[in-house]
Amino acid sequence: MYSDERSHYENFSLPVPYLPSFVRTGVIQEDSFDGCDYLVVTGCSSNHLVVTINMMLSVVLTNRDASFVLVDFGLKDSDYAYLASELRFIHSIHNALNSSAGVYYRRFAFSNFPEWWDISDKRIRGGYSWKVAAIYDLLLETKRIVVWSDGGNILPRNMGTELQHVYDFGAFSPASGDTIQKWVHGASQSFLHHNKMVRRIMRGKGMCNGAFIAFDYNNENAMNNVVFPFVQCAYTRMCISPLKTSRKNHRQDQAILSVLMHSAKVEKSCIGGHDTDVLIHNDCKGVSCGLLREFVVTSINQKYRVSIPLSPDC
């Protein structure tokens, strides 16, 4: 199941009738990297759509040629008209900037995965295993750098520092605060240790931030010692979300990522002082979302010296 991506998504290669025709489906095409050597992926269910739109706008801000993938983890029928309008707006910005970026959409097929992957379970949110699967699929497809950014994040004008860490060390995730001892449940630690999935569990080390993760497919250490065991763990409940764990005593995907990154000795990650210019978790509602959106579009106008309207209605 790990690599059978066609079973991971509904109607994987088929056009989506309720989205604009420029929105691509299926395998990522090579021309999506004509102007940018990495791919950004994000995803959301209905309750995070607005903040995810803001994040996708910020992809244009950080690099006009950066292609991105939106993974639908549970949008409602009533969401698609709004999504289509916003994707048209982003497409209009791409056109104004003569961008080579591609816009991709895929809908996650939860019915083909274990029941405990259920994103609506507020206790564990399926261990966020669906996120790990989406990242891994794109690493296998593209064989390039894949950047996961949560909806609610705002990417900066320049991601040079973050990307340089990926070029140098094969992976990057900023620090999130507190330690492995506090946020990685003992049952997960035991599973990783007894199954020899890590070299060592460094309990005093800091936690990585699962809201922003980047991997380079062509880095052997990152793939062998972080990505592959991360995926294996994501498919194993005893590893990523043991019984009696919840988000109150365990950090699911972020917990496992933290243990693996430190065990693999990935430099410049998950350590205070080697932080990021990415604005993490700018979750918002109502007026505050609109103001954040205006900030991103205004920043696009300033960076590229264009005059994009602040919204599709302007």
Predicted regions and their residues:
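Short beta-strand/loop segment that forms part of the nucleotide-sugar
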Residues: S67-L75
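Short, acidic, metal-binding catalytic loop of nucleotide-sugar glycosyltransferases
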Residues: S58-A66
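GT-A fold catalytic core of metal-dependent nucleotide-sugar glycosyltransferases
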Residues: W130-G186
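Active-site-proximal specificity loops/subdomain of glycosyltransferases
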Residues: K76-E141
